Amino acid sequence: MDYKETLNLPSTEFSMRANLVKKEPEMLKKWKEMDDYNLVLKSREGKPKFVLHDGPPYANGNIHIGTATNKILKDIVIRYKTMRGYYAPYVPGWDTHGLPIEHRVSVEMGEKIKEMSPVEIRQKCKDFALNFVNIQREQFKRLGVRGDWDNPYLTLDPKYETHILNIFKTLVKNGNVYRGNKPVYWCPTCKTALAEAEVEYHDHSSPSIYVKFKLIGEENTYVVIWTTTPWTLPANVAIAVHPEYDYVKIKVDGEYWIVAEGLLNKFAAETEINYEVVEKFKGKDLEYKKAKHPFIDRESLIVLADYVTLEDGTGCVHTAPGHGAEDYLTGLKYNLPVLSPVNEEGIFTEEAGKYAGLKIWDANKVIIEDLEKLGALIKTQKIEHSYPHCWRCKNPIIFRATPQWFISVDKNNLREKVLEEIKKVEWHPKWGENRITAMVKERPDWTISRQRVWGTPIPAIKCKHCGEVFIDEKVIDSFITIVEKEGTDAWFKLPEKEIIPEDVKCPKCGHNEFEKTYDTLDVWIDSGCSFEAVIRSKGEKFPVDLYLEGDDQHRGWFQSSIFMSVAHTGQAPYKSVVTHGFIKDEHGRKMSKSLGNVIDPKEIVDKYGADILRLWVSSIDFFDNIRVGKNIIQQQVEVYKKIRNTLRFLLGNLSNFTKNDLVEFDKLLPLDKWALGRLQEVISQVTEHYEKYEFSKVYSLINRYCTVELSATYLDILKDRLYVEAKDSIYRRSAQTVMFYILDALIKMLAPVLVFTTEEAYQLSPLKEFDTVHLEYWPQVRKEFVDEKLMEEFKILFMVRDDVLKALENARKNDIIGHSLDAKVTLNGVNEQINNVLVKYKDYLEEIFIVSQVEIGEGKVKGEFANVSVEKASGEKCQRCWKYSEETGKDEEYPNTCPRCAAVLKGLRK
């Protein structure tokens, strides 16, 4: 007789092959038809709110691995919180103004852009941005990210723009906005000012020169400066020294040079000079002395500055207030002129004399040659150093003094208020607080004006009579009213008389004829106002629960948001901030096209499915820098297969099981009680990790639970009972009851991550109660399922099991047995406690060890917890269950079966 037909073999439509690439789009279609986002929200109406506010990515290209990771992390949080019973909306947004988009449009339009009006350029930018909003929206949806995709927030939306202008008005009203001729980061390529957050640092090769400035009033005496920007020397008006440092006058070939004593050895080594120290004095003794500029007919004042260091150079710092932030502040203190003879394209103006018309980078060489001819050059060489570059065009930038609009970060104690609010926020990881605190403490005033057309216009006007440029609250109010109906294009379209109220007067001369100015706001103002435009104005919970972005946003969106919010509302816009690191390749290198190590999320999704990408995101300790590559993704494919196979085994063995078949805890078999108790521990630990946003710990725990504790242990042990015992016997139903609870918990714990796979499993499972798994609630820890004494006893049993498995493996190597069911095990515990446990559970040891026979007796091989002997099992092999028994073959009706199998087949074993 073929006994295979009498076994309870697994049966499920949940295939071993995932085929996610085909199935996922089908599920997305189904979710769209059921309007899953609103369906889920409706199911949580009246529940406590959890609001994660989405930081807007730029709508200027396809999503990349960084934006994909960010959105998936947010989606995991939202889905988890929803399952915990929160009303957790998710409104995605896009940053749609600014230089990144205008730069792309400029490149696409080429020379044509010079003939286009501002309104035409803005329309092209708008079209460009909206196109990529649509592209990115579909790409994010394909990742399984659930949100209000039909109603995102866009910074170009007129309603949004009115909120920007209202907050700007608050800043104006509070006196935080001012106009100044200060040096700012300037991109000569993009021809605009940049804020700190728009600056990147890359390696750059620069000339390094030592230059002599002749000291006036002292014969043959020179102050030596060092600079890596020779092109700024035409703007030099001072030399800064540290008041408390020691300086020396050294004799070199009949001349006297002044340098800091702390840098003398380094300076002498680099310049290869022989010298003699003739005098020593403090830096403060040099204050107000004057030196002669080496190639321009003017004097350079010696001034004091605490920022002078002894790291490089000579301790005598070339100072040009028009080309440096610290230089500018020193210039204010000493009433120095602010010279910046460079135009918007980085070309010298007439003010630079003989260098007029030269590009600043080309001028370096000419200036060095002139210094050499004049005998002022001591040494020149090339150095590689970290230098600021434009975030958009990636070209080197400069400091350039131009009239700009600024936000004073100290007016009305704004900086101090922000620092106080930072302390109230919960930062993950904790070092995030120190990082943003240091940045806020050190940050200069905020340059908010941009010389571009694609942005929110700064409603500043210029008096036609005296040239005064100013901002009037009445003009802002008038413009806001217009923007509500027409958008900010109106600033570029409408004549002044339709925007500027008649009663506006010039604060300087009293006249009332004006023209508009056309600077636009820094885009960090735009996105920094999202707390008002998206949250407060719509009556959402404020402050929100969470901001979650890359750690570069400590100087970006986190900072712009808290400054705007504190200025407007007096408090931080967020309760908690979670940051993730930068994404690098699997070797820790930055991704770049030239290295060929760029990982495209679309390629992963198209090849493996979005759930594989999501599983990878859950696997990373994202608080640190993140690594990804083809090998790492392939590892996730293997992990996914193990998780999927665990789900498949559970589903296959629950195919005929319903909730009516559940066995009460007290009636469960001991092994099943242990497994159910262990499940409660897993649920508790997984929940704790989710709460702390430690998704990599969730991943590791569930991965180990599925592969080691379930597939390789508990489920492996259960196969005999599941397949061999009677379909509805207590032996099988006890196992199925626990498998039911495990499947329920596993699907729910994995649902925030494997959104597609868990949906597929849920639809085929006996635990389905809702139309989608994503309407389900989080599994609860049930203490009534934990028998503490039994859990401790099984801890001992599994330690003994490890010793038994080692002994079985040795027996297999020595050809004593083939399969473990060929074995008889004799064992005893190494102490009385272990032995008592073995005796107590002796009737279950065959099952736990997956052997045919177990005897409590003297084992020959010493183990850590038990002494174990393995020999060939006695009797004959049952053709149905493959276990050996001396009673096998004695049943006439079912020959070749053991007594247990014969009883099952006769319906006698229930």
Swiss-Prot record:
GO cellular component annotations, sorted alphabetically? cytosol
Task: Check the record and name the CDD domains matching this protein.
Answer: Anticodon_Ia_Ile_BEm (cd07960), IleRS_core (cd00818)
Family annotation (Gene3D superfamilies): 1.10.730.20, HUPs (3.40.50.620), Ile-tRNA synthetase CP2 domain-like (1.10.10.830)
Q: What is an example of a GO molecular function annotated in this UniProt entry?
A: isoleucine-tRNA ligase activity
Any GO BP: isoleucyl-tRNA aminoacylation
Q: Where does motif 'HIGH' region map? A: 57-67
Cell compartments where the protein resides:
Cytoplasm
Q: What UniProt keywords apply to this chain's record, in alphabetical order?
A: Aminoacyl-tRNA synthetase, ATP-binding, Cytoplasm, Ligase, Metal-binding, Nucleotide-binding, Protein biosynthesis, Zinc
Enzymatic reactions: tRNA(Ile) + L-isoleucine + ATP = L-isoleucyl-tRNA(Ile) + AMP + diphosphate
Cofactor(s) for this UniProt protein: Zn(2+)
Kindly list the cysteine pairs connected by disulfide bridges.
none
Cofactor remark from the record: Binds 1 zinc ion per subunit.
Sequence positions that bind Zn(2+): C878, C881, C898, C901
EC top class named in words: ligase
Q: Which residues bind ATP?
A: K593
- Which Enzyme Commission numbers does its entry carry? 6.1.1.5
Q: Name one Pfam family in it.
A: tRNA-synt_1
According to its UniProt record, which protein family does this protein belong to?
Belongs to the class-I aminoacyl-tRNA synthetase family. IleS type 1 subfamily.
Task: Cite the domain annotation text.
Answer: IleRS has two distinct active sites: one for aminoacylation and one for editing. The misactivated valine is translocated from the active site to the editing site, which sterically excludes the correctly activated isoleucine. The single editing site contains two valyl binding pockets, one specific for each substrate (Val-AMP or Val-tRNA(Ile)).
Could you identify this protein by its name? Isoleucine--tRNA ligase
Q: Which organism is it from?
A: Thermosipho africanus (strain TCF52B)
